[in-house]
């Protein structure tokens, strides 16, 4: 097959090629013949359906499938013929040389030159899980199951305080009538610090007027940038009641027999999974920042960056919607604000791929299986999760890409100049 190539930009190529019409027709005839032998149509015996009926009923579908398949096959052959390493998806348009001619516009991997990772400087972090970390996690689990008991004393940090508030901004009262009601846990920064400190010591039925400074960008214009008198009245004070770490509490987390040592062992295993992921994320950032600094001058494929920026915007919009917030109308150029970050992400991704290609790094089956089992172990039916991955090509492909990226990141870090830094568990997981 002959395919012509034209350079239309630093990283853009245009491939012109034609489909072999004889192969297309041969495929269509063969596929229609298969359908004729196996299909059942009312009024005809199996295998005796006239070719004209088969053509009328299935011709368009078979032709479309054959055209798509041969188009992919011919395009792939053209890419191999010209030894192109393309990125992203091609844009394929009809050509001007007849019904079966096509033009594919593609972007190619930029030339990074000799990638010498030994010149990079990477900090490798490590951490260990202590008994104190396990104790802290158990305390967190207790607090998740806490209940609240009303008390008559004054409020203190950690208490749940039901409050009524109203504000006076000059001549304007907010709300105009009545009060705003809500509840906060003191000491968690849920309200302005002035208000939280003002509530400390107040008991049920007591009130206090406070001078509160509102930021200039506050959502209520009449309060923005002003010092406002805010009156708080305590409706109720409740103290936390945390459950004891007893057999019933431990069993509620799926630990059979309620054994405390098994409970701590399970918690340690969970923390180790969390720590492993956190340390890899730190290493990924370290290596990524070094690669960006070293290869920032290399031009990235514009269309690939554009698509990545749009994907990042869509991800942020989806996150906002999941949080229950209204996104409103999105400007057509909203993705432009993501382009710098998108270009860096594309650069790191392409460099990681090039390191793997040049050094013939292959996906390690052992590491893939370990990662799959690690993910599955966080579910109640791990074997079902493993089976789901094995039966879903898209899911498995995503996992393979992730594991391969981690392999390459490790490979780079091992060969770069690196220093070791030990962190506490809490610092290590703080992203």
Curated annotation (Swiss-Prot):
Keyword Cell division part of the UniProt annotation: yes
Top-rank lineage group of the source organism: Bacteria
Keywords per UniProt: Cell cycle, Cell division, Chaperone, Cytoplasm, Isomerase, Rotamase
GO MF assignments: peptidyl-prolyl cis-trans isomerase activity; protein folding chaperone; ribosome binding
Record flagged with keyword Cell division: yes
Xref: Gene3D superfamilies: 3.10.50.40, Trigger factor ribosome-binding domain, Trigger factor, C-terminal domain
GO biological process annotation, one example: protein unfolding
Enzyme class at the top of the EC tree: isomerase
Main localization of the protein described in the UniProt heading: cytoplasm
A GO CC annotation given for this chain: cytoplasm
Subcellular location: Cytoplasm
InterPro entries referenced in this protein's UniProt entry, alphabetically: PPIase_dom_sf, Trig_fac, Trigger_fac_C, Trigger_fac_C_sf, Trigger_fac_ribosome-bd_bac, Trigger_fac_ribosome-bd_sf, Trigger_fact/SurA_dom_sf
Catalytic activity, reaction form: [protein]-peptidylproline (omega=180) = [protein]-peptidylproline (omega=0)
E.C. number(s) listed in UniProt: 5.2.1.8
Domain PPIase FKBP-type: 158-243
Notes on the domains: Consists of 3 domains; the N-terminus binds the ribosome, the middle domain has PPIase activity, while the C-terminus has intrinsic chaperone activity on its own.
PANTHER family the UniProt entry points to: TRIGGER FACTOR CHAPERONE AND PEPTIDYL-PROLYL CIS/TRANS ISOMERASE (PTHR30560), TRIGGER FACTOR-LIKE PROTEIN TIG, CHLOROPLASTIC (PTHR30560:SF3)
Family the UniProt entry places it in: Belongs to the FKBP-type PPIase family. Tig subfamily.
Functional summary from the UniProt entry: Involved in protein export. Acts as a chaperone by maintaining the newly synthesized protein in an open conformation. Functions as a peptidyl-prolyl cis-trans isomerase.
Protein name (Swiss-Prot/TrEMBL): Trigger factor
